[in-house]
Amino acid sequence: MIRVDNIVKYYGEHLALKGISYTINKGEIVGFLGPNGAGKSTMMRIITGYLPATSGFVYLDDYEIYDNPIELKRKIGYMPENISLYTEMTVIDYLKFAAKLKGISRKHIKGALENTIEITGLTKYKDRIIGHLSKGYKQRTGIAQAIIHDPEVLILDEPTSGLDPNQLIEVRSLIKSLGGTRTVILSTHILSEVEDTCERALIIDNGELIAEDTIEGLKTAMDREILGGNIELKVAGKVEDALIRVREVQGVIQAETDNFGSIIIECERGNDIRASIVKHLVQGDFEVLEIRAKERSLEEVFIYFTDKKKSEDFDKSKYIK
């Protein structure tokens, strides 16, 4: 388990992190989500022990990271955003070098190499020169050096930056496979990255943790508070006639059709009026084919929370679980 307690970081007079606290449980895959310059990379460097905090504490399994830094750092694997790979070396020679740096004994290096190369899908590429690899396989090599010593915690900073769509899918699948047995923390400004890969998201903006929950939990928190096109309805028959009927229901703010023949309904804050809509339509001899809460995108959630942070009455404690 990782526990971060009131971390503050100054660079000179610039306040980069503003008293951030959170807990990450063993086996979770958690995403740090935020715009460029939000403080994600700084937070990761502090967790790894690479960068000291100005104040606050980081605990790994209830031990403070600086109490026994060498022992605790052995439990962490780290791939920085711009990892320096030795491009003139082969993949296997580079991983041997990484294994020795991380203190793996001579008798265990062969097994560690075989296991890591298999997990990261590098078997066919182990004898290739790193400089000749595609961006996707360079990223796999970077992840391989981070897990060569079988760490309990894996920290990946922008692991899919610069990848093409096929490479994105492959690396995301690899990251998901690494969870469960180990804790995985990744940072990204790509919203789909968190939605596709992570179980939980921490939204960081301008050095502050402003929201923390599962993706669905964040969407639910947003839905509780705002007006929105949050009901999607499909009916048999004349959609325009059904639209008139829907607008008569108490609690409906606005209702319009979309390009796919569905009716999109905005309703009052915190008011689930789906049953009322169905009842009113049935009374008008309309057949309801489907009615459901319209899915929020993570992009909507991110924009909502970062915009809400600017308001004077913003209370981030309401959105941190």
Predicted regions and their residues:
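C-terminal coupling/interaction segments
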Residues: 269-321
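ABC transporter nucleotide-binding domain
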Residues: 172-268
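Hydrophobic/anchoring residues in structured secondary elements
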Residues: 9, 254-257, 293
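Non-catalytic surface loops within mature trypsin-like serine protease
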Residues: 26, 124, 235-237, 267-269, ...
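ABC transporter nucleotide-binding domains
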Residues: 2-4, 9-211
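Residue-level "edge-of-site" marker
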Residues: 112, 130, 259-260, 294
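Short beta->alpha junction loops/turns
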Residues: 65, 236-238, 270, 294-295
